[in-house]
Amino acid sequence: MAKVAKKIAVIGGGWAGCAAAVTLTQNGHPVSLFESAKTLGGRARGVEINGLTVDNGQHILLGAYQQSLNLMKLVGIDLNTAFLRLPLQMIYPEHEDGMHFVAPRLPAPLHMLVALWKATGLRREDKLALARFSSTARWMGWKLNTDCTVAELLQRFDQTDRLCRLMWNPLCIAALNTPAEQASAQVFLNVLRDSLGASRAASDMLLPRLNLSALFPEKAAEFIQRHGADATCSGAIKAIKKNDASRWIIQVNQQERMFDGVIIATDASNAQRMLNEAGTGMTLPPLTYEAITSCYLQYAQGTRLPRPMYTLLDDPQQQRWGQYVFDRGQLHDDQSGLFAVVISAPEEHQQDHQSLASAIARQLADSFQRPELANPLWHQIITEKRATFSCTPSLQRPRNITGIPGLALAGDYTQGDYPATLEGAISSGICAATEVINSLRT
């Protein structure tokens, strides 16, 4: 428990804000968590469509995401039932000109060596290039002297066109949500270091069996409430300022409330607005953003894919937008026949939803050689236009600490090793809570 409990407000009920609130509560500080939306989770939350609770975007966690997994356990999530744990894999439909790469359950680095040896769809020169990349990256300590794009890094390491198309580019999009031609090579290496370059379990892929709100944010709110804190949804912050006694005054839903510390855990643009209102004089570095689109396709009950997840060969020129497909019926008992297709590409937003869904359904029918997949019963398109920041080389990201006692920032956009991921958000929330606690002690 803290020696002197401080009353702290956390503004924003996304994953970063929930992580900050749990960390503060764990350290004995009374917390008030404010979320302007009706549900917790921010850009990773459950949404209702056609009587089903799905996600506003399909997410994969890695076994390396220890801070996320530890906090989930702390708030009462059973990791064994909350996830389908798969070995690291990249598998394309058998009728596509793709690859089949699955890491066996062997100790590292044997699991990667055996996976590479057994991989189909890769030629000898592709496998040698992958082995060369892995060994050199390890020798370098997964560090670059100067950041560059992922595409430039792959060129320096003489990676083959086929390996880039089938493995590196899809991995880059999945991890950073930024095209390889624009993505930070150092951040990409950070993700590879903590997955491919770590223990076998760290490279495991964790597919959620719960909707994203239930996976952490809702349990986090229950956790802090059990410890006497409060969590308020639909709680719009109207103003934030500091009084002469160095306490923070927050106006929420026409009420003024007073706190010793504040963590701003909103997106960057709203954080900047609040910093301006508080008269901090701080200016956050500018960010650009990338979209993610999820296309849900409902088929007849019992319609299944051979595996829960596949990588797809995308080709915007041929109206093949899908990059990954998930059979949610293998993850959620009440979602038989529901497929989720993930698209990270700017061109598709120029299409109407009906045209986009039809194109994706045709892509699945062709990729799996199953004509019935061209005709779903219904579809739903969900686009997060500012899903992640563009993770470009040498990007300046703000620190959690602001230099103002009792005030910190939290969010996946803050300074850290990872791109805009759930682990990045949770790590930032933990760090922000620690910074506020330390600043109020001095």
Please place each PLM-identified region on the residue numbering.
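Conserved flavin/dinucleotide-binding core of flavoenzymes
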Residues: 324-442
